[in-house]
Amino acid sequence: MACMRRFIPFLSVALLAACSTPAEEPQPPHYVALGDSYAAMGSTTLPLDPPNTCVRAQDSYPELAAKEMDAELTNVACQGASTLDVLSSAGEHPAQVDALREDTDLVSLSIGGNDASFVRLTQCATDDICQAESGPQIDLEIRDLPRRLDKVYEEIHRRSPDAKVLATGYLPLIKRGETCPYIEKIPASDREWLARSIERINQAVREAAERNGATYVL
């Protein structure tokens, strides 16, 4: 959570830049938060905003940033979301992009991990057969991630052509060369693979942001 809070100044600067031209009757800037649990979750000490299945915390980084910037926030981030959930309806949740408006000023995007089996990757930190069982599938998913992310950006720009877009990456589950009693049963080669997988996801997220005129912030 502390790392996500360091993201707030970047949002503030971006919003100031996006709203540099004063209107005749100033209106609060419109900020839309899209993404997965990295954007939805915060501490567990406050009640959740509905729907509770999204685990959308009242002290998530979008909520804190919106208060800091005095912005009108539409927060549709949801735990477990993938690029498919951003672009299309999934059960009780409408497509996240439906929250975008033509006059949206700022969009934060925290997405991509679940397209590459991020939950399975978290299990790999304590699973000594993870790479053998899931490695090939996760590799294919990471390779396909740029295409999926480009589709998301295409839709964001179509719906909110003047919005500034900030993209976030994912914190490492295991650092290269790291060892501790909790993970010592995992072969060194598997630990390196896990660290590299998160690096590849972040690389895909960063490069997609650069291709599509967004700003990447880890």
Predicted regions and their residues:
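Structural recognition of the beta-strand scaffold that forms the well-ordered cores
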Residues: 30-35, 39-40, 72-77, 105-110, ...
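Oxyanion-hole/transition-state-stabilizing segment in secreted/luminal serine hydrolases
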Residues: 85, 92-141, 172
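Substrate-gating cap/lid alpha-helix
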Residues: 175-218
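C-terminal motif of bacterial Sec signal peptides marking the signal peptidase cleavage site
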Residues: 16-18
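A structural motif corresponding to the C-terminal end of an alpha-helix
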Residues: 65-72, 148-166, 200-218
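Sec-dependent signal peptide recognition
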Residues: 5-10
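Serine-esterase "nucleophile elbow" of acetyl-processing enzymes
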Residues: 24-77
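Bacterial signal peptide processing site
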Residues: 20-22
